[in-house]
Amino acid sequence: MPRLESGAWSCSCAARARHAARPGEAAPKADAMQSPSPSAGRAEREASGGSATTWRQHLVQRSVVLFVVGAFMALVLNLLQIQRNVTLFPDEVIATLFSSAWWVPPCCGTAAAVVGLLYPCIDSHLGEPHKFKREWASVMRCIAVFVGINHASAKLDFANNVQLSLTLAALSLGLWWTFDRSRSGLGLGITIAFVATLITQFLVYNGVYQYTSPDFLYIRSWLPCIFFSGGVTVGNIGRQLAMGIPEKPHND
């Protein structure tokens, strides 16, 4: 019996020793699983670098498209204003290409690129999704309404400029309500209208060009409405271009 008891005691001690050794054996395996291999880290860095390059390419492409759209729209709308004898340029400027000052389309194209990139960035920052389904058909309708508002500002005859300004303001807000309806779009549109009107006032004051029958500090009082609706339109174009692009990579 003493031999049996000593044998049983030795077996139990050996079993406990084996159980105690198992966590120590599993620890190196867990450490090996948790520690990333050099090849995995290199692959992750390459993937991050590739996504960053793709994001930059999309950013450049969107900027170019917005610049071209803004420059073309400025050229067409300015021609409409000149034909209606609303905007007056000096004789030497009228003689230039397409009867427009050479600097107007590039400036408007640059502004369109900035505004078009700013709209989706602010939407992403505020976490405010667009309320409507984004599709190019809606964007084209928005552009058509904007061109109609600009054409109406030059063609329609009202008893006074106050009625014209109120009408265009209502149309501009209707454009925002129909195609945007976001707080960020409203705020950016108002900011764009204010800043662009100040810049136009500065240019007119320095004799770069002038308006016929100015009624508010040398410029037309309805001009902020045009800038507001133009900002909303370019913002919708920028939002549409921003769909389906990869997000900007973040380095942890």
UniProtKB/Swiss-Prot annotation:
Q: Where is this motif: KxHxx?
A: 246-252
Main localization category: endoplasmic reticulum
What does the UniProt entry say about where the protein is found? Endoplasmic reticulum membrane
Which BP terms from GO are recorded?
cellular response to insulin stimulus; cholesterol biosynthetic process; SREBP signaling pathway; SREBP-SCAP complex retention in endoplasmic reticulum
List the transmembrane segments: 60-82, 102-119, 135-157, 161-179, 185-206, 221-238
Coiled-coil regions listed in the entry:
none
Q: Which UniProt keywords apply?
A: Cholesterol metabolism, Endoplasmic reticulum, Lipid metabolism, Lipid-binding, Membrane, Steroid metabolism, Sterol metabolism, Transmembrane, Transmembrane helix
Protein name, per record: Insulin-induced gene 1 protein
